[in-house]
Amino acid sequence: MAQGQNRTVLQSGQMHNSVVASASSVSSQPNMVNGISQDTLLLRQEMLNRTYAWLQQRQPSKTDDASKAKLSEVAKRLESAMWRTATSKEDYLDFRSFDVRVESTLKQLLSQRRANPSSSVSTMVQTPGVSHGWGQSYTATPMVDTSKFNSSNNLSDATTETGRLLPTNRMYRGTINNGRQELSAVGQMIPTPGFDNSANADVYQSHRNEEYSGDGGKLLATGSDFGNPSQLQKQRPTGSNDLMGYNLDHQLGGGFRSNIHQNTSGMTSIPLNAGVGMSGNNVHLANVPRSSEGVLSSTHFSTFSQPSQQPVEQLQVSHVNRYSMSNSGTFVSGNLYGVQTSSGSIETAVDMNSMSLNSMRRVDTSFGSQSGLQNNPLLKPHLRHQFENGNFQSSSNSKENLAQVSHRPLERQFNQQAHYGQYHQQELLMNNDAYRQSQPASNLVSQVKNEPRVEYYNEAFQMQAINKVEPSKPQNQYKQNTVKDEYVGAQSAPVSSSQLKMSPSFPPQTHQTQQVSQWKDSSSLSAGVQPVSGLGQWHSSSQNLTPISKNSNEEREHFGVRFHKQHEGTNNSSSVRESTNCLTVAPSGTLDVPHLPVGINVLSKQLNGDCGLSYKNQRRWLLFLLHVRKCNAAEDNCESKYCFTAKTLLKHINCCKAPACAYQYCHQTRQLIHHYKHCGDEACPVCVFVKNFKEKQKEKFTFLQRAEPSSASLNHGPKESFESMRTSSERDSEAPFVVDDLQPSPKRQKVEKPSQFAYPDTQGNPATISAGVSQAHFSMGLQEKDRLPSDVCKPVRSNVPMNADSSDSSRRLVPVSRELEKPVCKDTHMGRHGVKSALDGESLRLSKQEKPKRMNEISAPKEENAEQSLGVVSASNCGKSKIKGVSLIELFTPEQVEEHIRGLRQWVGQSKTKAEKNKAMGLSMSENSCQLCAVERLAFEPTPIYCTPCGARVKRNAMHYTVVAGESRHYVCIPCYNEARANTVSVDGTPVPKSRFEKKKNDEEVEESWVQCDKCQAWQHQICALFNGRRNHGQAEYTCPNCYIQEVEQGERKPVSQNVILGAKSLPASTLSNHLEQRLFKKLKQERQERARLQGKSYEEVPGADSLVIRVVASVDKILEVKPRFLDIFREDNYSSEFPYKSKAILLFQKIEGVEVCLFGMYVQEFGTDSASPNQRRVYLSYLDSVKYFRPDVRTVSGEALRTFVYHEILIGYLDYCKKRGFSSCYIWACPPLKGEDYILYCHPEIQKTPKTDKLREWYLAMLKKASKEKVVVECTNFYDHFFVQSGECRAKVTAARLPYFDGDYWPGAAEDLIDQMSQEEDGKKSNRKLMPKKVISKRALKAVGQLDLSVNASKDLLLMHKLGEIILPMKEDFIMVHLQHCCKHCCTLMVSGNRWVCNQCKNFQICDKCHEVEENRVEKEKHPVNQKEKHVLYPVAIDNIPTEIKDNDDILESEFFDTRQAFLSLCQGNHYQYDTLRRAKHSSMMILYHLHNPTVPAFAMACAICQQELETAQGWRCEVCPDYDVCNACYSKGINHPHSIISRPSATDSVVQNTQTNQIQNAQLREVLLHVMTCCTAQCQYPRCRVIKGLIRHGLVCKTRGCIACKKMWSLFRLHSRNCRDPQCKVPKCRELRAHFSRKQQQADSRRRAAVMEMVRQRAADTTASTPE
């Protein structure tokens, strides 16, 4: 990362620091505040007393006056903070929530303190006589007690010591102009006499002792009051965990630590540009007992001013820390440790007697310039020679061994990294025993600990932890990783393996090496997964090492041998597998990454104890991959820059089954996953750690959830995410709702809900915490021996690959760090820039000596999400709760599961050839095959795409242009793109620059997604497993069908209840659905009985159709607008401009092999009595579709297929229902879908041929014939005969005003085109060839009636009817008119009231009352029958049982996905809900039912007010008063703090009507809020959700991401409004555009349909002409 970013962070931190200081001054003297009344002062005093008492309860041992004074100071700060954050006096004095508010305030102050530690500048004065380098900017770099550093470098519990200034003005982009001058800056400052703010140290230190007592006796940190060395012997009692999770020192102590003790550990003070190659002082100051973070404890000083009692030549002096050294107390004998490199470092010792204090000035810059130590006169000649040559050779005399640096000129900057990386590791070696001779390692990291906030520390370490040398050749040659000469962070000096002489003769080193691994890991995990492949390559002699406990000698010796073997394996590997030690990231993105040793069993050996240093990294790797599995953020949106790259790796693993895959990190990662899945060892240092890690997270998460409501009340913002409530005192943004993407990821995400906690954002505001785990919850001290550092990486499932393109986007998860987030690799074996990926499997190794028993004592994040995310093994191993309903298999009995598997391998729906091919593949099943269907690779059908401007379908493999505009992606065909002469192309009325378009080929292919069993690790297709990726919120354990059968048979589990996974029967029933079901079941029973009678069998012996469910899944009120040109012709005749109607969608489900499969669907339009003529009381059967999977596949008595019988009965039942409700007619257009397109159900099976028009028409007529027999249908005719001709005694006027006007029908669109052509012809314009046929309309037909003036509307009407008749006549039989009531033969109206006058002699003649009156007044000649002498007598027949008004008693069922057939089809296409095979039809139907049971707008689905997770139907609890307060079951069970009563949300099965009404109310409320927002000008409007909607709209105006969660919410709201809006001047953003967009899409679809029909007619005419003999 560029160093300029560090400077930016510094500035924000400095500014924030002043704010905190100001607040402190105010809070410390509350009575001095002007303008506060005496009563208020008394109230505040009362609150101060209560706060003091609260603190005293937690400090029972502090009874002396000094301690009380310190507690009083802390109480003042807390009271002042609560006063500032309270919104009202009542809120301030609410003692019911006092405890929670205090705790919340502590957390907030913690964020400020960590971001703004007390600066040492105020306690320093300039050293007289020393040049200060005026003009330079000095950076305060407080020293940090890193015992609280977790493994992500999070300063969770940091106490700080300040006392350094370093000039930063000469540091830019990783270079240092004057290192010596900058390093000497600290020496120019001395402490201010008499200023000591360490008075409060013991108050906070006691809290630290209390909280971290569970860490097994962690050494006390630096503090001015700890002068007695005996304190170091005291170990805290185990098991003590403060419920708060934070001690006072953790939260406020940073500003009260002593500033007197300077950097006694000899670490380099560096500026905020952490990682600059300033390692010149990386020579140890002294060997003294130290705290676990490398900070010298004050207990090591007898007196502050006691002079050094060690020979000067034994002191490892850094001139930067010369002042600190001179003040240090008694020092033990010191050793100078040399530098260690990243690729094969050697730890050696140097006789300190050979060096003098005077030489240290040269030592300061030697590592930066490679000249300092060479000029040291006291350095032994052979050691100096070794150092100059960079040869890391182990000397026989251990005191004379010095780790050496490669001296190649191009690698000189990497030498700086060597000090950093290895001394940083040595630092932890000294943390084992307070009385052990420590070997402190001075390194760059300890300088970074002096930064003002933990984020800076993260950046510094991440920079140099990622930037490293990459092995470029198998011969162990290393190339230099340079990026424009910008090196951020110290970089490792490369050392070839030939320079490393491994020997198992140094077992004492091993334990310390383990500690190095721990410290390296604990300080670098924020860099993600840092491979430590070279940690086993240490060279040392046991003479040099500090004594270690005897009981570990044997194991240490074993480790030494293992390191040697590991190193050999590494050096024998190929170039892509050579091992290096340190990971670095150069600013421009180049990356060199180590690789695991060659060998298939490497990982298993590591996990079984062959590589002790691997355990820590294995955990880190798993945790990082678990985050990657869950993260749904886009490539540039995730907090982790490497997240997207890791997704690429996991996506590769998705398909990879090669035993020795050459893809980088694939093979090793799979091995680790395999072990993790099968590990049952209770002492496994990798698996047990993760399990215990979860348990501790649960405890912390429980506490935080209880504190949540109070935190929210302190900040008075809308609903916020948990992390922002906990860490920021300036929170006012609404937490994003969790939005489900329509398309689940191809691989199951085995992670749980997104974290409600945060990692520190190293680049943001110090108080800002990104989605992840709070740094405050990763506080963990490094304990002695068995200490386990906290793995910061959220435990995320790593064993299952996932799609890199996860939409939905939409859910952020734990970022591993801010620096190891740079994408490193694409689908290649090398990185994106030709370098290796940072996700090296070598990083999967950990030290074995970390005992499982200590894992329970880790005070790491204890959030529930970590527990949920670790769904890696079965419940018996991982202890996590199972989420029911992730797979439909859970409903099945073992017999049903076996039936399902057998059905999968039958490939029902495919052609015979394809089915046989797949069956043959199943016989040769490989390890890469699905364990259920036995086939490996299955691809979905390509989704059809259409040109936005012209609506033409883009052919397969054809080139086209695409662009994202608005909320959707648009496609432009080549002709339309070329026709746009300008530099823009019009897309939905918006000009889009051609430069934004991307040229693509329509050849995209999407493979089916996979899922892995948590028990047997077998892989299956998600479709085969009936896996619902939408229900898997990353928290579900999945058991494959085979393991499920075993568990059921062994009694370990039972099939879940049907209420867990709601099916078709659980959908709300309606009057219509009940009518259809009852009638269908009755008819099926009769048919089955008749079949049994004819076959001579009993009823049970004859197969019958069962398990059928019919439901109305959409029923919404709509308005059909008449097209403008047509309306202009009949405006004078009071023709209605719009027709209200109700659109309904009806689906039929049948349970096949245990799954309810959608087999049939139809959309209808019902125009009731509220519609004007000619649409009044009419029904339009707009679309009908079915798939050929109905069971049983038998014939009825009449010889037709049983499925045809069922579908006919549904239609007849619907017509019967309409007739009883008062509808008079039904209109059917028998038009099959276009080739390659579908009406409702997406992608039909190959065994089902698309019917020709005549076949489809016959199918409808056969149904109507049955309906006529049952007297449901009165008469059938066709559209042309009924409206276009006057046959018989018909006296109705032939006019287009009589034609029923339906949405999507053929003639309205055709009429509009004809009228447009007529107008163009009249104006002399050229006809539009695309819209009209070539034939020119003639006026001859009008001459006979004398209508020659086309400007007259009547003439236009006649001409339009004439032309329409010509078009419709060839296919008039396809437009079927069904009369449900009798039709008057004179006026052609359908009679629904009064009497109908019937002629007994004529079979089908009746007239209405009105026409009968006219008939009686006619002359005898014109009476019925016309042109006959004998006149017939007409008899009246009363019309009854027809409602005068049509009312629909069914509830409105509104759904975004089922609003129209196009919306439903788009849902299926976008998510690949296909019906081409039965196996896919089952899965698609399962997903359709999921959407049906979750009908609310996705962006505004109910979310838990505490954890922000989306609540599914029938889940959670809600407040009876607050409309927006809903909580999930998990949060409710842990206790909530809400003033009102909470009730359970009703389930779909318990209260279908209530749920339906609730959904409609919610949608109506949202529409009302949006309309209110358009007129609201109040900033603090109290209208419900007003500010939320305003925030969404503001976000949409500035968002550059396009497609984020907030944008999806905004667009969903706009669509919800636009579907119901009819205001032509609506001011809601995008309303008119959306309506125009939908209308345009519908018109294009209708145009394609009409064009196909015309083509079919022409083809039919051509065939007829060709077949006619001459």
UniProtKB/Swiss-Prot annotation:
Subcellular location: Nucleus
Zn-finger (PHD-type) residues: 970-1046
Residues the record lists as binding Zn(2+) 4: C1519, C1522, H1538, H1540
Lineage: Eukaryota, Viridiplantae, Streptophyta, Embryophyta, Tracheophyta
Zn finger residue spans: ZZ-type: 1379-1442, 1499-1550
Keyword Nucleus applies: yes
CDD domains registered for this protein in UniProt: PHD_HAC_like
UniProt organism field: Arabidopsis thaliana
UniProt EC number: 2.3.1.48
One Pfam family named in its UniProt record: PHD
Function noted in UniProt: Acetyltransferase enzyme. Acetylates histones, giving a specific tag for transcriptional activation.
Binding, acetyl-CoA: L1184, D1185, S1186, R1203, T1204, W1259
Official protein name in the record: Histone acetyltransferase HAC5
Chain positions recorded as Zn(2+) 2 binding sites: C1399, C1402, H1424, H1432
InterPro entries referenced in this protein's UniProt entry, alphabetically: CBP_P300_HAT, Histone_AcTrfase_Rtt109/CBP, TAZ_dom_sf, Zinc_finger_PHD-type_CS, Znf_FYVE_PHD, Znf_PHD-finger, Znf_RING/FYVE/PHD, Znf_TAZ
Gene: HAC5
GO cellular component: mediator complex
Zn finger (TAZ-type) location: 611-690, 1554-1634
Alphabetized GO MF terms: histone acetyltransferase activity; zinc ion binding
Protein residues bound to Zn(2+) 3: C1504, C1507, C1528, C1531
Residues covered by region (Disordered): 490-554, 709-765, 830-863
Tissue and organ expression note: Rosette leaves, stems and flowers.
Reaction(s) this enzyme catalyzes, per UniProt: L-lysyl-[protein] + acetyl-CoA = N(6)-acetyl-L-lysyl-[protein] + CoA + H(+)
Binding site for Zn(2+) 1: C1384, C1387, C1408, C1411
Domain CBP/p300-type HAT: 1061-1497
